Curated annotation (Swiss-Prot):
[2Fe-2S] cluster binds at C152, C213, K283. It comes from Chlorobium phaeobacteroides (strain BS1). Keywords: 2Fe-2S, 4Fe-4S, Biotin biosynthesis, Iron, Iron-sulfur, Metal-binding, S-adenosyl-L-methionine, Transferase. The gene is bioB. It catalyses: (4R,5S)-dethiobiotin + (sulfur carrier)-SH + 2 reduced [2Fe-2S]-[ferredoxin] + 2 S-adenosyl-L-methionine = (sulfur carrier)-H + biotin + 2 5'-deoxyadenosine + 2 L-methionine + 2 oxidized [2Fe-2S]-[ferredoxin]. One of its GO terms (biological process) is biotin biosynthetic process. [4Fe-4S] cluster binds at C73, C77, C80. It holds the Pfam family Radical_SAM. SUPFAM superfamilies: Radical SAM enzymes. This is Biotin synthase.
Length: 339
C-alpha cells in the first residue's frame, strides 16, 4: 500500500534539499496541518536540524542563567512577575555581588554547562552608569575564573556605549526578545516602551559583532498566523540563537488565567521555526518542564537543538543532571554527543 505525504510537506522538503528558508506561503499551509500529518512535519524539521544545525562536535546547546537583579521593574510586560504594574509575589533584590554570581556560575560549570547568562530586571542601560560598570567587572571576573565559559548577558535595552563595552569584554551572546509578531507587541506584551527600542538594541549589537539571542513567548493571546509573522521577523533581524518559551501563567499578572496553546500548535510552531531558520540554534526555554511535561522531548525532535537548564528568572526548572540524561536519551535520534 502506498501512503502519500501531505502536498505542503512535500513542498517543504525543499528546505532539506537546499538549506534555504521555507517560503512564507508554504508556512501558512503547514500551519493548518492536523492529525497524522503533524508527525511528518516534525520528522522533516528534525532532519533539517540534523543536516544544517549541527553544533560543535554534534552537541546540543545548553545554557543556564542567574537572575542577578530581581523585581522592581517599571515596564508593564503582561506575562512578567517582576513588573511593578503586576501583583505577583516575587523576590526583590538589587544587583547581586560578584561572589554570589561567580559561585552560581561555578555550580553550573561543574555540571558541564559552558554558557552562562547574567540577567537583570528593568528597562536597561541607555548609558554607562555605576551599576553597569559593576556588571562588566563581574563579566570579567567570570571569564578569569572560568576561561572556557561563554559568558552571556540579558540586561534590557541598551545604548551604543554599553553595547561597545560588552563587545570589548567579549560577551558571547546577548539576549533581548521581541516576544511576538511586531504589530502585536504593544497590546500583547507591553506599551511602556516601543518594540523599536529592542530592535534598535539588536542592530547595535550586530554592529559591534555581538551575536544576538532573540526569541519570544507562545500562549499570550497570539494566533498561529501571528506566530509565523514573529518567526519571519526574526529572519529579518538575522538572529543567532532563538529561545522559544511557552507561557507559564503566574498569579498576579494579567495573563494568570491564560489558556495554554494546544500541544499540536506548539510543536508545529517549533517545527516551522526550524524550517524558516535551518542553521540557527533554536532552544526551548520556559514551559519545557511544566507546560510540555512528558512531551518536552517531542520538541527536541521537532527542530530544537538547545535548551535552558537549571531554572528560569522566577520559576524553577529541572536539575542539570536530569537534563544531561535527557540529552543522552535524545542522542538516539541523531548523531549528537552529550558534551
Amino acid at each position: 500500500m502506498t501512503v502519500e505525504m501531505n502536498k505542503s510537506i512535500v513542498k517543504a522538503y525543499s528546505v532539506l534539499e537546499t538549506g534555504e528558508p521555507l517560503p512564507f506561503d508554504v508556512a501558512v499551509e503547514l500551519a493548518h496541518l492536523a492529525g497524522e500529518d503533524v508527525p511528518d512535519l516534525l520528522s522533516l524539521a528534525n532532519k533539517v536540524k540534523n543536516r544544517y544545525a549541527t553544533l560543535s562536535e554534534g552537541a546540543l546547546h545548553s545554557c543556564s542563567i542567574i537572575n542577578a537583579k530581581s523585581g522592581v521593574c517599571a515596564e508593564n510586560c503582561r506575562f512578567c512577575a517582576q513588573s511593578l504594574h503586576n501583583s505577583a509575589d516575587v523576590e526583590q533584590y538589587s544587583l547581586l555581588d560578584a561572589e554570589a554570581i561567580v559561585r552560581s556560575a561555578g555550580d553550573v560549570y561543574d555540571e558541564g554547562i559552558r554558557h552562562f547568562g547574567v540577567v537583570t530586571s528593568g528597562y536597561g542601560y541607555r548609558k554607562v552608569n555605576p551599576e553597569f560598570l559593576k556588571i562588566v567587572a563581574i563579566i570579567d571576573q567570570l571569564r578569569q575564573e572560568y576561561p572556557d565559559l561563554n559568558v552571556c548577558a540579558s540586561l534590557g535595552i541598551l545604548g551604543e556605549e554599553p553595547v561597545r563595552m560588552l563587545a570589548e569584554h567579549n560577551v558571547r551572546h546577548y539576549n533581548i526578545n521581541i516576544q511576538v509578531a511586531p504589530d502585536r507587541y504593544s497590546d500583547l506584551i507591553a506599551d511602556s516602551h516601543p518594540l523599536k527600542d529592542r530592535i534598535d538594541t539588536i542592530r547595535l549589537l550586530r554592529k559591534y559583532g555581538i551575536p544576538v539571542c532573540c526569541g519570544g513567548i507562545l500562549g499570550v493571546g497570539e494566533t498561529m498566523r501571528e506566530r509565523l509573522d514573529f518567526i519571519y521577523a526574526l529572519q529579518e533581524l538575522d538572529i543567532a540563537v532563538i529561545p522559544l518559551n511557552v507561557l507559564v501563567p503566574i498569579e498576579g499578572t494579567p495573563l494568570q488565567g491564560a489558556a495554554t496553546p494546544a500541544l499540536t500548535d506548539i510543536v508545529k510552531t517549533f517545527a516551522l521555526c526550524r524550517l524558516v531558520h535551518p542553521g540557527k540554534i533554536i532552544k526551548f526555554a520556559a514551559g519545557r518542564e511544566t507546560v510540555m511535561n512528558d512531551f518536552q522531548g517531542l520538541l527536541m525532535l521537532a527542530g530544537a537543538n538547545g535548551f535552558l537548564t537549571g531554572g528560569y528568572l522566577t520559576t524553577r526548572g529541572r536539575k542539570i543532571g536530569d537534563d544531561r540524561e535527557f540529552m543522552r536519551q535524545l542522542a538516539g535520534f541523531a548523531e549528537v554527543s552529550c558534551s
